[in-house]
């Protein structure tokens, strides 16, 4: 059974929300890749569209968008995701994970690309009575 911590970022508000998903919802993400747009109902955000932007596995190895497949690979990199060189032109062999989501991924990062009619706080149950808009 797959369990994921999904960090959904809201570009309009500049906030991020952490959502734990498991079982059927998590299985719907397996096989998706970085850059894919999925329905927000998987995360409890009905009416929203969410784009997968990255993630990491249990050992902390990051997912690289241009590395095919779900497995880990040691690649020679000069810059980019997961590596910042200390000197100009420096290259290093780093362990990275492919762009496809597999059951051993722990965290999935995503951003909202299409908004629904309800607010995110209301859908996730984070809205308190003071924050709720007054019905007039």
From Swiss-Prot:
Instruction: List the InterPro entries hit by this protein, alphabetically.
Output: Ribosomal_eS6, Ribosomal_eS6_arc, Ribosomal_eS6_CS
- Check the record and name the PROSITE patterns matching this protein: RIBOSOMAL_S6E (PS00578)
Which SMART domains does the protein's record reference?
Answer: Ribosomal_S6e (SM01405)
Keyword hit for Transmembrane:
no
Q: List the disulfide bonds.
A: none
| Keyword terms, alphabetized | Ribonucleoprotein, Ribosomal protein
Q: Which GO terms describe its molecular function?
A: structural constituent of ribosome
**What GO biological process terms are annotated to this protein in UniProt?**
translation
Task: Tell me which GO cellular component terms the UniProt record holds.
Answer: ribonucleoprotein complex; ribosome
Protein family (similarity comment): Belongs to the eukaryotic ribosomal protein eS6 family.
Q: Which NCBIfam families match?
A: PRK04290.1-3
The name of this protein is: Small ribosomal subunit protein eS6
Gene that this polypeptide is encoded by: rps6e
């Amino acid at each position: 059974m797959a369990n994921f911590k999904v960090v959904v970022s809201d570009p309009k508000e500049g906030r991020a929300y952490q959502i734990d998903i498991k079982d059927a919802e998590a299985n719907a993400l397996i096989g998706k890749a970085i850059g894919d747009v999925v329905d927000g109902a998987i995360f409890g955000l009905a009416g929203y569209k969410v784009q997968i932007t990255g993630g990491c596995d249990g050992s902390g190895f990051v997912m690289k968008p241009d590395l095919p497949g779900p497995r880990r690979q040691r690649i020679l990199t000069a810059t980019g995701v997961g590596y910042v060189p200390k000197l100009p032109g420096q290259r290093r062999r780093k362990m990275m994970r492919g762009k496809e989501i597999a059951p051993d991924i722990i965290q999935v990062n995503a951003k909202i690309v299409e908004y629904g009619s309800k607010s995110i706080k209301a859908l996730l149950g984070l809205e308190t009575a003071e924050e709720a808009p007054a019905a007039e």
